[in-house]
Amino acid sequence: MTDNLTRAFKELLNQERFGSQSEIVDALKKQGFTGINQSKISRMLSKFGAVRTRNTKMEMVYCLPNELSVPNTSSPLKNLVLDVDHNAMLIVIKTTPGAAQLIARLLDSIGKSEGILGTIAGDDTIFVTPTSDKPIDELLQNVQRLFENAL
């Protein structure tokens, strides 16, 4: 296996979020690699410990183990926060697996000065509740600004 093929394979899994081995085969062929077939991709997936997991759109996709590792305080926020959405009552932040509690702790440390009453974090989802005097749109802007500045 060439270094170029290995590098391209890992980049595809890290960036493109492929759901099937045939999609990976097609993508590598489009990049000019020859002799690529499903059985070779299957061996590469096993060799690098790739697993199938759900992305934020609830699609099953291949990921490399380093993407699934527990993030730490040195992980850039841009790599951890996948989506920020809201309704009239709260903000929902989607993160990479394992990152929600780390980010919730950061938000809790900022707390009431930014209009955050509190957070509830699971593995990859955070609920952020505003203080009673903070409009949800203003809190959303504060949270988004925090992630932009920390990127």
UniProtKB/Swiss-Prot annotation:
Keywords: Amino-acid biosynthesis, Arginine biosynthesis, Cytoplasm, DNA-binding, Repressor, Transcription, Transcription regulation. The gene is argR. The lineage of its organism: Bacteria, Pseudomonadati, Pseudomonadota, Gammaproteobacteria, Pasteurellales. Belongs to the ArgR family. It comes from the Bacteria. This is Arginine repressor. One of its GO terms (biological process) is protein complex oligomerization. Pathway: Amino-acid biosynthesis; L-arginine biosynthesis [regulation]. InterPro entries: Arg_repress, Arg_repress_C, Arg_repress_C_sf, Arg_repress_DNA-bd, WH-like_DNA-bd_sf, WH_DNA-bd_sf. It is found in: Cytoplasm. Regulates arginine biosynthesis genes. Disulfide bonds: none annotated. GO terms for molecular function: arginine binding; DNA binding; DNA-binding transcription factor activity. It comes from Haemophilus influenzae (strain PittEE). GO terms for cellular component: cytoplasm.
